[in-house]
Design a protein with these regions (language model features):
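Classical eukaryotic N-terminal signal peptides for Sec-dependent ER targeting/secretion
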Residues: 1-8
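Noncatalytic scaffold domains of N-terminal-nucleophile
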Residues: 19-49, 61-179
Length: 179
């Protein structure tokens, strides 16, 4: 019994090491950053800097997001490629309205499941020929990223498109540091 208590005591001594008493480890680079004035965050510092410049020039969050989206096509294509698609949610605080833009890739108007996958039902296609839906010409779509970013800017941006894209174009022309 005494031995069990010693083992249990040693275990409980280790708990602070396993579960620190603070939620945030300020020595770690991975912790929340909080701001009252706004911030721009992306997977690339140079793209984020462009977004910050847009905000400082009087642009809104959508202007900054559009600039960062196009910039990432140059700085980090896997994160911001113009050959893909996506979704964007935009919240307008003044009206408490939420808007969504769906700019996933689309198939041509004349395409249909029968032409693409034969007479199988969608369930059969997913069960029998799942790879066809991902790795064949039938899976190809027209990219929607450019449309989506431009649509967001047109509907919700405050700066001109020229003002939003100037730093992005400059970045693409002048090149980036590759590490």
């Amino acid at each position: 019994m005494q031995f069990s208590r010693i083992i249990l005591f040693i275990f409980f001594l280790q708990i602070p090491e396993i579960y620190p008493d603070k939620y945030l480890d300020y020595k770690s680079p991975f912790h929340p950053t909080i701001s009252d004035t706004g911030m721009v965050v992306s997977q690339n510092l140079e793209s984020s800097k462009i977004g910050s410049q847009i905000l400082q020039a009087g642009g809104n969050a959508v202007d900054a997001a559009v600039a960062v989206g196009f910039s990432l096509a140059t700085t980090l294509p896997r994160a911001g490629n113009v050959g893909g698609g996506g979704f964007m949610l935009i919240y307008i605080k003044e009206n408490q309205e939420l808007f969504s833009i769906d700019y996933r890739g689309t198939s041509s108007l004349n395409s249909n499941l029968k032409d693409l996958f034969g007479s199988k039902s969608p369930a059969q296609i997913l069960e029998d020929d799942y790879d066809l839906t991902k790795y064949s010409y039938s899976a190809s779509t027209v990219p929607g990223t450019v449309y989506g970013l431009l649509e967001a800017h047109e509907k919700f941006g405050e700066l001109s498109l020229k003002e939003v894209l100037e730093p992005v174009i400059s970045q693409a022309k002048n090149g980036i540091i590759v590490t």
